[in-house]
Amino acid sequence: MTTLYGLSNCDSCRKARNWLDRFGVAHVFVDYREQLQSPATLVDWKEQVGGWDLMINKSSTTWRNLSPHRNAPGSDAEWKLLLREYPQLIRRPVVVTDDGVVSQGFSDNTFKARFGGYL
């Protein structure tokens, strides 16, 4: 079953959930502000999406309001601490399919490509 990670009040997450419902893709939703992800999970996501910088939303208000030393983590440990403290920095939604493949973000075209077998 596909797992969609994000925030309950996020428009992109709502759109992704609606898309999956509309096309009958079985999924569960996890609000990662309420259910923090383990450091190992964060590292797995980072490795699959291509790095910490690609995993976060640098245009978010939260990112812009961080102090300069916080928005320049120098190690995996610092990144993991930052994202567990501010999970809203993670680009949403994070989509993990049955086979463990991780992707981020929502668009109709990317979901059609990813879940085309359901259509």
What name fits each language-model region?
Residues 33-119:
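Thiol/selenol-based redox catalytic cores and closely related redox-interacting motifs
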Residues 1-23, 27-32:
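Local sequence-structure signature of Cys/Sec-based thiol-disulfide redox active-site neighborhoods
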